Amino acid sequence: MKILGIGNAIVDVISKVDENFIIKNNLTKSTMKLFFDENEFQNLLKNLKIEKTVSGGSVANSIVGISQLGDKAGFIGKISDDEFGSNYEEGLKKENVEYFYSKKKEGLPTGTCLILVTPDSERTMCTFLGTAGKINENDVSSDAIKKSEIIFLEGYLWDEGEPKKAFDKAINNANKVAMSLSDLFCVDRHKPHFLNLVKNKLDITFANEQEMTSLIEAKTFDEIINFSKQLNKLIVVTRGEKGAIAINGNEVVECDVKKNLKILDLTGAGDLFAAGFLHGYINKLPIKECLDKGTEMSSRVIQQIGARL
């Protein structure tokens, strides 16, 4: 197998709501709220008309993109034996992704992200991790990891104790490790640990400019470049409209992004960028072509609704 992803198996449930629904339920518009009470989450969900249900999760989105580009890819996650779990499984099978899953028959439901779309197209997300947040080292196949060229992980796995053990097992058995820092708040929560991973454990790090700035407490972007040069590892940083940059030792490669796109949804931009870049990387393309493929995939996904092509 070319690449194996390990991450939170989350089903995205999309529903259209009005502004009053956001206010009435004490939600902060255009942000993500993590729910810890299952009953509270289910009460919110049952009052809505579901427009669309699709398999999601950051690393899983990237893995699907890699499979769509023709590479053999797999995913390790945790779902429940329920309707959303079945939807998740079918979503990956449809995209020819090999799924090394653990399916629970009782207890917590499959992880769900409720995406509330207001008339102005803004998205407010409500997430209940459910079974996804319970992935552990026993769910991670050492054999599958050892047979994969690259393991791709998400920083979100550090938010729970058991997933962190799965993360550590993957790193210790992998041939090569790539990781997405996930988001700014995730970096802030785990800064010392992430810094150690970037310096000592990871072969490839994906981050946006804000995440890297926070990670090393940089004052300028040049500080990020200089920090990355010293590591002699591949650091890939996206910069929004400024494009993207890859630093590997003294090699610094940049690329631009397409301008004047009709942007509908930025949700999957980073996930699909990573998919395009890793596709190029595992097929031994020059770094510039890896960056170009990443920006191409990212540009495509932001012009549609949803995080998968």
What are the residue ranges of the model-derived segments?
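Glycine-rich phosphate/adenosyl-contacting loop at the front of the ribokinase-like
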Residues: 1-76, 86
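Conserved phosphate-binding/catalytic region of the ribokinase-like
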Residues: 3-9, 23-30, 47, 192, ...
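Hydrophobic beta-strand scaffold residues
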Residues: 73, 99, 177-178, 235
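A glycine-rich helix N-cap at a beta->alpha junction
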Residues: 91-108
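Conserved phosphate-binding/catalytic loop of the ribokinase/pfkB sugar-kinase fold
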Residues: 100-105, 115-161
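A short, aliphatic-rich alpha-helical micro-motif
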Residues: 144-146, 198-199, 229
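Conserved beta-alpha-beta core of the PfkB/ribokinase-like small-molecule kinase fold
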Residues: 150-225, 242-244
